[in-house]
């Protein structure tokens, strides 16, 4: 573990969102699995030291809006959503104000959302704490340190948990850190 305080880790800074509105089938199915796992945290991650684990889940849908330049791609994504039973609803941009009267629909070709508690967010630090506690109970050992180099790796599958620092360790792996920006907007309840 590079930093056991997690001061510079990405996860405590994230919003802990889980959703299923993706383009690829695999991501949609991962989103569905995540939701089911999150609902089962109290049972799955219970430990002797943490008998009541939680991630403070807030089930709330995501509204994704698309202009004309991205509408066709989203219509194709909706076919995957339907095939995966993702529960995604589509709204024509011209009808957006019927569902969300406080949103300016100008320039919006289509929008998608869920209202079946299949998406939302969690407290990522609580979730991490519950996962770590369960891992320790099952024998995992967390060691403070930092991998500086690797001599040779012979494996069918390799999982790098270095996140945005992967490139520093594995130069041939095409992972580039990206900065994400989140805006919080307070809207009236509908």
Segments and roles (model prediction):
Residues 1-11:
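Glycine-rich FAD pyrophosphate-binding loop
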Residues 12, 77-78, 170-172:
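Short amphipathic alpha-helical segments
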Residues 113-157, 161-162, 167:
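Helical element adjacent to the flavin cofactor pocket in flavoenzyme catalytic cores
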Residues 9-15, 102-106:
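Short, flexible, mixed-charge acidic loops at enzyme active sites
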Residues 7, 155-190:
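Central helical "cap/lid" subdomain
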Residues 11, 54-58, 174-176:
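Short beta-strand
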